Amino acid sequence: MSEVLRSFGLAVRIFRERQGWSQAQLAQNSGIDRAYISRIESGGVDPGLEMQRRLANALGISHTELIAQAEEEEQRRRRRPDRSGDQPA
C-alpha cells in the first residue's frame, strides 16, 4: 500500500470526523459507496480526481484543501522514525 494513498485516506478521515460524520453519512452525502470510502480511508484504493472532488464537495472543502491535508499527513509520516528508531532517509 502506498504511503501517499494512506496519507490521502487519513486526510479524508480527518475531515469526515471534523464533520462528526460516520462513513455511512459521508457515503450518503457524496454518493460514494460506504465500503469504497472505507477502502479510501485505509489507503487501499487510489481514488481518481472525480472521486476526490466528490469527497471534498461533500465535506464542504475545496479539493485543494483536501490535497493540502494529505500532503501535510505525508510530511508527518516522513518525519516519524521507523519502527527500528532510525530516521527515514
Model-derived features with residue positions:
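DNA major-groove recognition helix of helix-turn-helix/homeodomain DNA-binding modules
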Residues: E50-E65
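DNA major-groove recognition helix of helix-turn-helix
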Residues: E41, M51, A70
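Short basic helix-loop element that most often maps to the first helix and adjoining turn
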Residues: L10-N29, R54, R80-P88
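Short, charged recognition helix plus adjacent turn
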Residues: S2, E65-A89
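Short amphipathic helical patch at the helix-1/turn junction of helix-turn-helix
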Residues: R6, E17-R18, D46
